[in-house]
From Swiss-Prot:
InterPro entries: Ald_DH/histidinol_DH, Histidinol_DH_CS, Histidinol_DH_monofunct, Hstdl_DH. Belongs to the histidinol dehydrogenase family. Its cofactor is Zn(2+). It comes from Campylobacter jejuni (strain RM1221). One of its GO terms (cellular component) is cytosol. Pathway: Amino-acid biosynthesis; L-histidine biosynthesis; L-histidine from 5-phospho-alpha-D-ribose 1-diphosphate: step 9/9. Substrate binds at S234, Q256, H259, H324, D357, E411, H416. This is Histidinol dehydrogenase. It holds the Pfam family Histidinol_dh.
Length: 428
């Protein structure tokens, strides 16, 4: 890994050191995705069946998975894996149940009652990528909060042939319908509906550049669907002092690097000696990984930055605004106070990112590409919306009436003023 001393860099070099890999061929991807969406809108299920063969090399005759197929998948699944999934399920459920909002009701002025009520989004679509690493854990991260929030209809899409663990998790979480469809076409089907696919109000879940672009396009169409967030390549930043275990640090860096060639990992440490030990350990562990080729490409986009102290390390982290922030120092909770931007934070030597990815209870769907400066990790609130209520008695109306008349008049909104004036006159 490239090693840089932060204080030796000029402003432009510092900016380059924290630069993320460019998302390539964006215009080309946009055109392809537009074409795929149009096909699904025009041909419905037929387009999805054709796309399954073209993109996923899967011959299918239907889109919707039957209950029998789900039952058989659960029977085939390894019992140890089932038990591990249940452990994760319970922790994720506990953490998200704790996020159930309390309704707010107060009297702002005598006779003026104001409330905040929460209501679930009615129909949600969950997208689970396929490929060599089936992300069945993402089913838990999406479906559990959807169920707790009270969404009336929860549907799930994943490329054919859907992994048994994905089907097991979907059944466990109470998903209503499962569709074997993938990529941009799946996003289009969820946004607009087909003969077999329910049109949803909001789409959740990660995916490749085509899925991300499809989510962007359908969310900008008033007839499409809302989305959870715009996701970029996965990333981690690790802050480590000289007493950190370089083996632990390297394993945390590589656990993120193996996600994909466009993932990025950054280590911020305090000395050349630790930087060298960590870099050597990364190379040693990398050689043993089955996904070595993917992780190697990610490591090429990554670097080690040497900070003069932990305060500067925090400054670097806040500038980068990582998806995952791991702090392996002697007093990690002390540093937490200075963290401004991060999707999820992992404190101490025994809090690897893997715990949050699977079973600690927090959600692993996180903003990337610097969006943690303005966006939050996925939570229960994303599956619901708030509405406000006000109720004024005659006494409350009279208390505010004159002030509202003056405010409306000065904004030159006469109908607003009249709505108050007519009522005031009726009470004389």
């Amino acid at each position: 890994m490239q090693i840089l001393v932060y204080d030796n860099l000029d402003e432009k070099q510092k900016e380059e050191a924290l630069k993320r890999p460019a998302i390539s061929a964006k215009d080309e991807i946009s055109k392809i995705v537009s074409s795929i969406i149009k096909e699904v809108q025009e041909k419905g299920d037929e387009a999805l069946i054709e796309q399954a063969l073209k993109f996923d090399k899967a011959e299918i005759s239907k889109i919707k998975i039957t209950q029998e197929e789900i039952t058989q998948a659960s029977k085939r699944l390894d019992k140890d894996l089932q038990e591990a999934i249940l452990v994760a399920y319970e922790n994720i459920k506990k953490f998200h149940e704790a996020q159930i909002p309390h309704e707010i009701a107060l009297e702002t002025t005598k006779g003026v009652k104001c409330e905040v009520l929460t209501r679930p989004i009615e129909k949600v679509g969950l997208y689970i990528p396929g490929g060599l690493a089936p992300l069945f854990s993402t089913v838990l991260m999406l479906a559990i909060p959807a169920k707790i929030a009270g969404c009336e209809k929860i549907v799930l899409a994943s490329p054919a042939k859907i992994n048994d663990a994905v089907l097991f998790c979907a059944k466990l979480c109470g998903v209503d319908e499962i569709y074997q469809m993938g990529g941009a076409g799946a996003i289009a089907a969820l946004a607009y509906g087909t003969q077999s696919v329910l049109k949803v109000d909001k789409i959740f879940g990660p995916g490749n550049a085509f899925v991300t672009e499809a989510k962007r396009q359908v969310s900008s169409d008033i007839n499409g669907a809302a989305i959870d967030m715009q996701a970029g390549p996965s990333e981690v930043l690790v802050i480590a002092d000289d007493l950190a275990n370089e083996k632990f640090v390297a394993s945390d860096l590589l656990s993120q690097a193996e996600h994909g060639a466009d993932s990025q990992v950054i280590l911020v440490c305090l000395s050349q000696d630790f930087a060298k030990k960590a870099s050597d350990e990364v190379q040693s562990q990398l050689e043993l990984l089955p996904r070595k080729e993917l992780a190697s490409k990610s490591i090429a986009n990554s670097r080690i930055i040497i900070a003069k102290d932990l305060n500067q390390a925090l400054e670097i982290s806040n500038l980068y605004a990582p998806e995952h922030l791991i702090i392996q120092t002697q007093n990690p909770r002390e540093l937490l106070k200075g963290v401004k931007h991060a999707g999820s934070v992992f404190l101490g030597a025994y809090s690897p990112e893997s715990m949050g990815d699977y079973a600690s209870g927090t959600n692993h769907v996180l903003p990337t590409y610097g969006l943690t400066k303005t966006h939050s990790s996925l939570g229960l609130a994303d599956f619901s919306k708030r509405m406000t209520v006000q109720e004024l008695s005659k006494e409350g109306f009279l208390a505010l009436g004159k002030s509202v008349e003056i405010l409306a008049q000065n904004e030159h909104l006469d109908a607003h003023k009249n709505a108050v004036t007519f009522r005031l006159e009726s009470l004389k």
